[in-house]
């Protein structure tokens, strides 16, 4: 496997050739003073040698297997690192979340992987399917990565996705709930420089991958939506040039030259509620082609279920991620209102 990766420099190909597991982990050094460790299928770590590094960056993709643009973006970066085209100055862990689902061309095989973090994999039915086992392993790999160095570290986790439906804001990020911790203006402007100028502040703990890293390691973590889902090879990768350039600068320790925080350059939303499915007959009143961030006025009936109506409570609420087909008990939609900068630092 080492020789295969050394020759091809294509970690995605190695991962897809062994979607369930690798028979062994391995490590090696590149000629440009970079140490590489492969921990599992879809799990590869790069660490610069001989330099003082202060940042730990996790880049995850394919938590949903059919969200291909982030997979291609991460594979480009991994190939550049393996080909010694980049001079790495900070530690990076790449995670290809759900390789079997990539093969299958679906979001998941048995269960939505991004509902299984922060210990959810072992609750209820326990480790009863491959996604639950994978969620536990991914948590362990993040812990291993973030725990490897002590002292003052800047930890980041960007979990990259694409959305099922079209959006009024093509690229947007979900900033996980942080309790009493402030939200980072610097991180928001980093994302703005990546072409992601719309931020959703979550209102409660969740079981997503980004919340896991934020809550347990105080990482600056985000779920980042980079556009709409397309099949592998059909993504217009020019739409991700800014993201790739900023991630490259970050990994290579270059000056980021971020603009000052400016509300005029941003769209900030506060999640005001998450609507969970209670009955099998749940249905939205709007059509399937309604875009993310479509706004509805107070009193508008968003959905019906079990003889009840779900109505808009604020003057206006925008919706994201509507999905009536989830199992009972899971989220069907997030409702948003405008946010200000009162909780930003």
Curated annotation (Swiss-Prot):
Keywords: Arginine metabolism, Hydrolase, Metal-binding, Zinc. One of its GO terms (biological process) is arginine catabolic process to succinate. GO terms for molecular function: hydrolase activity, acting on ester bonds; succinylglutamate desuccinylase activity; zinc ion binding. The keyword Hydrolase applies. It catalyses: N-succinyl-L-glutamate + H2O = L-glutamate + succinate. This is Succinylglutamate desuccinylase. Transforms N(2)-succinylglutamate into succinate and glutamate. It comes from Shewanella pealeana (strain ATCC 700345 / ANG-SQ1). Pfam families: AstE_AspA_cat, AstE_AspA_hybrid.
């Amino acid at each position: 496997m080492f020789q295969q990766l050394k020759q091809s420099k294509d970690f995605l190909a190695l991962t897809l050739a062994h979607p369930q597991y690798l028979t062994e982990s391995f490590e090696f050094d590149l000629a440009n003073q970079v140490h590489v460790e492969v921990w599992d299928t879809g799990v590869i770590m790069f660490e610069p040698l001989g330099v003082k590094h202060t940042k730990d960056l996790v880049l995850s993709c394919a938590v949903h297997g059919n969200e291909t643009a982030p997979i291609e973006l991460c594979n480009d970066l991994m190939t550049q690192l393996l080909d010694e085209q980049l001079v790495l100055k900070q530690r990076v862990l790449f995670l290809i979340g759900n390789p079997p689902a990539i093969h299958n061309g679906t979001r998941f095989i048995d269960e939505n992987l991004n509902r299984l973090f922060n210990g959810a994999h072992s609750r209820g039915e326990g480790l009863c399917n491959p996604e639950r086992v994978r969620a536990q392993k991914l948590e362990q790999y993040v812990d291993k990565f973030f725990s490897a160095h002590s002292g003052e570290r800047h930890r980041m986790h960007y979990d990259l996705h694409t959305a099922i439906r079209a959006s009024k804001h093509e690229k947007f990020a979900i900033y996980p709930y942080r309790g009493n911790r402030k939200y980072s203006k610097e991180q928001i402007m980093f994302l703005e420089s990546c072409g992601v100028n719309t931020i959703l502040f979550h209102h409660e703990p969740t079981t997503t991958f980004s919340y896991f890293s934020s809550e347990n390691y105080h990482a600056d973590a985000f779920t980042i939506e980079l556009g709409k889902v397309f099949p592998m090879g059909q993504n217009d990768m020019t739409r991700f040039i800014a993201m790739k350039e900023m991630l490259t600068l970050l990994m290579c320790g270059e000056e980021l030259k971020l603009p000052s925080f400016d509300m005029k350059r941003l769209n900030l939303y506060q999640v005001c509620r998450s609507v969970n499915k209670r009955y099998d007959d749940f249905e939205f009143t709007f059509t399937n082609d309604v875009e993310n961030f479509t706004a509805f006025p107070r009193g508008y009936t968003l959905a019906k279920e079990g003889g009840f109506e779900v109505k808009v409570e604020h003057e206006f609420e925008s919706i994201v991620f509507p999905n009536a087909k989830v199992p009972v008990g899971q989220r069907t939609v997030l409702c948003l209102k405008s946010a200000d900068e009162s909780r930003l630092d």
